[in-house]
Amino acid sequence: MDLPVGPGAAGPSNVPAFLTKLWTLVSDPDTDALICWSPSGNSFHVFDQGQFAKEVLPKYFKHNNMASFVRQLNMYGFRKVVHIEQGGLVKPERDDTEFQHPCFLRGQEQLLENIKRKVTSVSTLKSEDIKIRQDSVTKLLTDVQLMKGKQECMDSKLLAMKHENEALWREVASLRQKHAQQQKVVNKLIQFLISLVQSNRILGVKRKIPLMLNDSGSAHSMPKYSRQFSLEHVHGSGPYSAPSPAYSSSSLYAPDAVASSGPIISDITELAPASPMASPGGSIDERPLSSSPLVRVKEEPPSPPQSPRVEEASPGRPSSVDTLLSPTALIDSILRESEPAPASVTALTDARGHTDTEGRPPSPPPTSTPEKCLSVACLDKNELSDHLDAMDSNLDNLQTMLSSHGFSVDTSALLDLFSPSVTVPDMSLPDLDSSLASIQELLSPQEPPRPPEAENSSPDSGKQLVHYTAQPLFLLDPGSVDTGSNDLPVLFELGEGSYFSEGDGFAEDPTISLLTGSEPPKAKDPTVS
């Protein structure tokens, strides 16, 4: 309940009621014990806020809340004055609160008009600040549209690059798959070609077989790929012929069939009547082998290292004629001497006893005149042994060089090469002839190239088994075999081969023709028309 303001405290009518009541309350001397002016008159003090709220506030206001009174003072701009002694932690002995306002002064009531209540004023923006210029908006929209277009262009480019990247990855995967498959096929082809080269060169077979030229007590080892042959008589008559059953190849290597001083090749041909003459080199051993056909083995002492000689003996003349004989001359002499009569042909029969002959007329029976003997002198055993050792060393070096590359043949890989897993379009391979030639050139740098005629002439080229044993060559009586046989003697085959060329190496070393593994082209029989 508001108390009536005294006549001295009457103020202008535009002063708020709160300020008028506050002026009267502060100026009332009855309430100086609780509220009064400061000594300077610029502020007022409130003592004992609790008692002031209970006793004084209800008389002038409708409430007795000190907090509401302080809040109204703040609304009109009054500020609380804080002294130094009141700002510490120690509570002051007297509860004293001082408020001041620049226009609330003692004795100057007219200044109350200047005290205004604070109004929560929101700063009103000016219209020119709120209004945005149209050109700025247009420019902003243009920039936004431009940025949007650039973004769409970048998105399209990124999408195109993404598609291209996916296509490239798919192509890379396809190429990798094709490359792996092609590499697999190439590896299989290389392994297959290497296996062919290895089979042609007889790689991986290392033999250390004694020559057994001097050892007649031990039998030679049988060849790995041997077939049972038999030499059968056609004519049983003759000074050296004896009926005997067909013998196999095992009898050829019997210990008693090898002379103590080395094997001697002898040939018996039909000639005109001539008297035999003793040869100065030795005597003829006419011992027939057990179960063997007509064979003559001549024992002679080792000859000096020179070309073989032919000893032509006649019993009517005491002198002997020694002439240098090359294998070509020997074959030519045999061919010339066999012109009057059909040439001697070896009839080969297998283990079952079948003889391969043609329907040709047999040769006339041999006459009772003495026969002319042509014998090839024994080669020097040391020279032949050195030659075989050199060839063995060369083969070992070649095998070591080829094995150092670490080639391995996988049979399963070779079987998979022709399996249905590899389709026909995938087998588009390069030229196999050039690849095989290049691989052979790389694998065998030390081997001289052979002429193509020698390779094509042999049906079993590349499948021969080299056998380092000294085997005697047996030449049969021309009268004891059929002239219509398909197989010619060994010396007839050597006459037309490429082994005896015009070079010095071939003329001086006739053992090459005896040790080679491939067969030369067979000579045509001059007696067969």
From Swiss-Prot:
Quaternary structure (record): Monomer; cytoplasmic latent and transcriptionally inactive monomeric form in unstressed cells. Homotrimer; in response to stress, such as heat shock, homotrimerizes and translocates into the nucleus, binds to heat shock element (HSE) sequences in promoter of heat shock protein (HSP) genes and acquires transcriptional ability. Interacts (via monomeric form) with FKBP4; this interaction occurs in unstressed cells.
Name of this protein: Heat shock factor protein 1
Source species taxonomy: Eukaryota, Metazoa, Chordata, Craniata, Vertebrata
Residues with N-acetylmethionine modification: 1
InterPro entries: HSF_DNA-bd, Vert_HSTF_C, WH-like_DNA-bd_sf, WH_DNA-bd_sf
Location of cross-link Glycyl lysine isopeptide (Lys-Gly) (interchain with G-Cter in SUMO2): 91, 126, 131, 208, 224, 298
Effect of residue 147 to A: Leads to constitutive homotrimerization and DNA-binding activities at 20 degrees Celsius. Does not lead to constitutive transactivation activity at 20 degrees Celsius. No effect on DNA-binding activity at 37 degrees Celsius
Covalent link Glycyl lysine isopeptide (Lys-Gly) (interchain with G-Cter in SUMO), residues: 298
Outcome after substituting residue 391 to K: Leads to constitutive DNA-binding and homotrimerization activities at 20 degrees Celsius. No effect on DNA-binding activity at 37 degrees Celsius
Phenotype upon changing residue 193 to A: Does not lead to constitutive homotrimerization and DNA-binding activities at 20 degrees Celsius. Leads to constitutive homotrimerization and DNA-binding activities at 30 degrees Celsius
Designated gene of the protein: HSF1
